[in-house]
UniProtKB/Swiss-Prot annotation:
Keywords: Cell wall biogenesis/degradation, Disulfide bond, Lyase, Periplasm, Signal. This is Soluble lytic murein transglycosylase. It is found in: Periplasm. One of its GO terms (cellular component) is periplasmic space. GO terms for biological process: cell wall organization; peptidoglycan metabolic process. The gene is slt. InterPro entries: Lysozyme-like_dom_sf (IPR023346), Lytic_TGlycoase_superhlx_L_sf (IPR037061), Lytic_TGlycosylase_superhlx_L (IPR012289), Lytic_TGlycosylase_superhlx_U (IPR008939), Transglyc_AS (IPR000189), Transglycosylase_SLT_dom_1 (IPR008258).
Length: 645
């Protein structure tokens, strides 16, 4: 009986293999393919590679099969032959990881020191900086020196520290005697401007022995920009030393604008600055003298400097300062200083009309406001509200029937499956490739297709890629409508306002993370989430990972928005600014304006360009969402419009 057991087990194993083979042969349905895909991934994660090898061949028709191939290749990239990687890249030209793989394998071939093989694999410049450095080193290694030196120069001219792979390229370039001394100095300047003190020190330390005096001066300046006057007086006046002095001077001005202001004549004399270079220093200081704490002498000096400036952005900042102070005379003066091109911006056309109305020139003012109303966005809606007229949204309609050719093909099939598996960010990469390769009319159809599939973020992404600004339905889908209905019920904030905030924050990508750690649809910081959960007794919150779940994010996000909305008297202008820049800053801005200005002036005078644009967008987006909900779509409520700020 015991002797029969091995035979029995061999028979069972053969039967299992036969059943598996039969299953492989007939695994045609999408549901079966998805199940097998999940099984393969699970086996892979458990390092059951025999199971992976057995099951993969039966999944070649599944749209995400190339991702399995990619994993197989990259798991053992050090031992992959170039032909295998080349075949994969060529077979999947639109697959996002294939482009990543190309750069990775260039670096692998560099590790092998297979320079000819590297150039055969990648005849064109690869995508990443590290791979490019290896590519141009391969050019040098194979005798293509001119191309190598040009590539080295292009990679050299940055204030960032480059990958270690670039060191050997830069070393052979320097040793060849072909490195341009001006390029060397330019990188020091760029590093200084980027605040990369470590790189400045390294580069200065590598300068030839005969340049040790200037090298020492550069290092001293990088370590303490307050030495700028000593630097200016002890180094010869050259374009390089003037540029270095200007960068250091900007750092001084950030710390002590008055000290910088008084320093200008000495710098001008020491470095023999011309009027244009001198004005650049004045502009730097003028930017720092826009607060409420400047003296009368500083204010006069600032305005004299701006009056001579050619910087449009600086003059615009001065216009906004006049708006925030309720200084009508200053508003007129500084608007007049703007160049003609800048005066055509929506905001400055509106304020020109505002001044005309004040002078009784109603016909001219109304002509400007009516012209603005033909456009889209914040100021066109403001113009309508100022005139007491209804604003008409222009909405372009995408074709109801999407061309079937656009919805077929491997890219769209992969997008569908990635969205099924909730791999939103990978799907976005695939979608971006697909949309980018299409005509504008096809992009509109793709936006509509995504809209119909409830791929809200992909719908928005297609309208952005195609600049389909009047396709408002696809740009502003009623995403997660049920969740927003539920979590705004019983709150003072409207559903449309909460959705406008979410649309501005994430463009409806539920998996997006900001560089500073904000997560999900309403871009919530972990600390804010913890505080809000406690304040509102929100149950079942376990940690920041849940912020990528739409329901959790909307629950916490709408609660926090309700909190700031109530803090600021149910005013969306203040609440939106606070959501973006923090409640403390909004209180400071309110204290500065001191009830002297109207709502539009307050928005335009917000000193942070990001927050200013944020508030304008949210108010406009709220109006769009109210339109799609069949509600009144005036930009501001009566209380927001009529109060003083």
């Amino acid at each position: 009986m015991d002797r029969a057991k091995p035979f029995v087990w061999r028979l069972v194993a053969a039967s299992v293999c036969l059943l598996t083979f039969c299953h492989l042969a007939r695994a045609d349905s999408l549901e079966e393919q998805r199940n097998r895909y999940a099984q393969i991934k699970q086996a892979w994660d458990n390092r059951q590679m025999d199971v992976v090898e057995q099951m993969m061949p039966g999944l070649k028709d599944y749209p995400l099969y190339p991702y399995l191939e990619y994993r197989k290749i990259t798991d053992d990239l050090m031992n992959q032959p170039a032909i295998a990687v080349t075949q994969f890249v060529r077979a999947n030209p639109t697959l996002p990881p294939a482009r990543t793989l190309q750069s990775r394998f260039v670096n692998e071939l560099a590790r092998r020191e297979d320079w000819r093989g590297l150039l055969a694999f990648s005849p064109e410049k690869p995508g990443t900086t590290e791979a490019q450095c290896n590519y141009y080193y391969a050019k040098w290694s194979t005798g293509q020196t001119e191309a190598a030196w040009q590539g080295a120069k292009d990679l050299w001219l940055t204030g960032k520290s480059q990958p270690n792979a670039c060191d050997k390229l830069f070393s052979v370039w320097r040793a060849s005697g072909k490195q341009d001394p001006l390029a060397y100095l330019e990188r020091i300047r760029l590093a200084m401007k980027a605040g990369n003190t470590g790189l400045v020190t390294v580069l200065a330390g590598q300068m030839p022995a005969e340049y040790q005096t200037i090298a020492s001066a550069i290092i001293t300046l990088a370590n303490d920009p307050n030495n700028v006057l000593i630097f200016a007086r002890t180094t010869g006046a050259t374009d390089f030393t003037r540029q270095m002095a200007e960068v250091a001077f900007a750092s001084v001005a950030r710390q002590d604008a008055e000290n910088a202001r008084l320093m200008i004549p000495s710098l001008v004399q020491a470095q023999k600055l011309n009027e244009e270079q001198t004005q650049a220093l004045r502009d730097i200081v003028a930017w720092r003298l826009m607060g409420n704490d400047v003296t009368d002498a500083q204010a006069k000096w600032r305005d004299d400097a701006i009056m001579r400036s050619q910087s449009t952005s600086l003059i615009e900042r001065r216009v906004r300062m006049a708006l925030g102070m309720g200084d009508r005379r200053g508003l007129n003066t500084w608007l007049a200083r703007l160049p003609m091109e800048a005066k055509e911006k929506d905001e400055w056309r509106y304020w020109q009309a505002d001044l005309l109305l004040e002078r009784g020139r109603d016909a001219e003012a109304k002509e400007i406001l009516h012209a603005l109303m033909q456009k889209r966005g914040f100021y066109p809606m403001v113009a309508a509200q100022r005139l007491g007229e209804e604003y008409t949204l222009k909405i372009d309609k995408a074709p109801a029937n999407v061309n079937s050719a656009l919805t077929q093909g491997p890219e769209m099939a992969r997008v569908r499956e990635l969205m099924y598996w909730n791999l939103d960010n990978t799907a976005r990469s695939e979608w971006a490739n697909l949309v980018k390769s299409r005509s504008k009319s096809e992009q509109a159809q793709l936006a509509r297709y995504a809209f119909n599939q409830h791929w809200w973020d992909l719908s928005v992404q297609a309208t952005i890629a195609g600049k389909l600004w009047d396709h408002l339905e696809e740009r502003f889908p009623l995403a997660y409508n049920d969740l927003f209905t539920r979590y705004t019920r019983g709150k003072d904030i409207s559903q449309s306002y909460a959705m406008a905030i979410a649309r501005q924050e994430s463009a409806w990508n539920p998996k997006v993370k900001s560089p500073v750690g904000a997560s999900g649809l309403m871009q919530i910081m972990p600390g804010t989430a913890t505080h809000t959960v406690k304040m509102f007794s929100i149950p079942d919150y376990r940690g920041p990972g849940q912020l990528l779940e739409p329901e959790t994010n909307i629950n916490i996000g709408t609660s926090y928005l309700q909190y700031v909305y109530q803090q600021f008297g149910n005013n969306r202008i203040f609440a939106s600014a606070a959501y973006n820049a923090g409640p403390g800053r909004v209180r400071t801005w309110l204290g500065n304006s001191a009830g002297r200005i109207d709502a539009v002036a307050f928005v335009e005078s917000i000193p942070f360009s990001e927050t200013r644009g944020y508030v304008k967008n949210v108010l406009a987006y709220d109006a769009y969402y109210r339109h799609f909900m069949g509600q009144k779509e005036a930009l501001m409520s009566d209380s927001e419009w009529q109060r003083r700020y």
